[in-house]
C-alpha cells in the first residue's frame, strides 16, 4: 500500500522573491506589494523558508533543499516534477515561460541520481497543453485517486490521459474563483491528508459539487474550507 503522507520533502531556497507578472492573469490570489522594497520582501521569504524547513525537520521529516534562481520568481513552488515511492519521477508542462525555466539541468541531474525519469511532457508546452504536476493534481495516493480542477494550467484531456496511463481514478471538476474565473491550481482549494481532506466545496461549480462531495467523503473525514479561507491559502497544506 502507498503511504499517503511523505516523510521526505524537496524545497527550493529563494534567491529572490517577487510577484510573477507572467502568471498574474491566471492567479487571482497573487498580490503585489507596492509599499515595501524588493530586497525586504526577499528577506522575509528567505526567513519564512528557513522557519518552515526547521519546523518540518523538528517533526522528524527529512528535507532536501536546493538553491533557486533569480530568474524564476516561483522557484520556491517546485511543481514541475513528481517523485513516486517506487523511485521514479516525471516532469510536467508549465504554462509561464519563466516557470519552464525552473527545470534547471543541475536539478534534474540531482534528482535523477535517485529517481528514474520515466516521462517528460515538457514538449506539450509548444502546443499550449499544460499539466502542472502536484498543483494541478491533488493525490489520494493510498486509494489511487487524483482530484483535478480544470483551468488554463490544468488541461482536462491531458489529465485524463495521465490518469489512464498511470492507473489513477480521476475526479474531474470545474471551479469558479471570487473573480469569476477558474481557480488556477487544484491545490489552492484542497489537500489530502492521512485521515482528513480539507476542501472548499463552495468554489466548485454546482453541477460538480455533490459528485466531489461524495468522493472526498468516501475514505476521509472532511474539513470544509470557506472561499475566504482559501484566499489566505488555507487549502495549501502538507
Question: What positions do the PLM features span?
Answer:
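The feature marks the mature, well-folded catalytic cores of soluble enzymes
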Residues: 1-238
Amino acid at each position: 500500500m502507498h503511504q499517503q503522507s511523505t516523510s521526505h520533502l524537496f524545497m527550493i531556497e529563494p534567491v529572490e522573491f517577487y510577484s510573477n507578472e507572467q502568471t498574474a492573469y491566471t492567479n487571482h490570489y497573487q498580490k503585489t506589494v507596492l509599499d515595501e522594497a524588493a530586497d525586504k520582501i526577499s528577506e522575509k521569504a528567505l526567513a519564512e523558508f528557513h522557519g518552515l524547513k526547521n519546523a518540518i525537520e523538528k517533526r522528524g521529516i527529512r528535507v532536501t533543499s536546493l538553491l533557486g534562481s533569480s530568474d524564476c520568481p516561483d522557484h520556491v513552488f517546485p511543481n514541475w516534477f513528481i517523485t513516486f515511492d517506487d523511485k521514479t519521477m516525471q516532469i510536467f508542462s508549465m504554462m509561464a515561460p519563466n516557470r519552464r525555466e525552473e527545470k534547471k539541468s543541475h536539478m534534474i541531474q540531482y534528482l535523477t541520481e535517485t529517481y528514474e525519469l520515466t516521462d517528460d511532457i515538457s514538449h506539450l508546452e509548444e502546443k499550449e497543453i499544460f499539466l502542472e504536476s502536484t498543483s494541478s493534481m491533488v493525490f489520494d495516493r493510498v486509494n489511487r485517486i487524483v482530484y483535478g480542477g480544470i483551468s488554463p494550467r490544468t488541461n482536462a484531456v491531458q489529465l485524463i490521459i495521465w490518469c489512464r496511463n498511470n492507473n489513477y481514478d480521476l475526479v474531474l471538476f470545474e471551479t469558479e474563483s471570487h473573480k469569476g474565473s477558474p481557480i488556477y491550481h487544484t491545490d489552492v482549494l484542497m489537500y489530502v491528508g492521512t485521515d482528513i481532506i480539507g476542501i472548499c466545496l463552495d468554489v466548485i461549480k454546482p453541477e460538480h459539487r455533490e459528485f466531489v462531495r461524495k468522493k472526498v467523503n468516501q475514505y476521509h473525514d472532511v474539513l470544509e474550507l470557506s472561499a475566504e479561507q482559501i484566499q489566505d491559502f488555507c487549502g495549501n497544506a502538507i
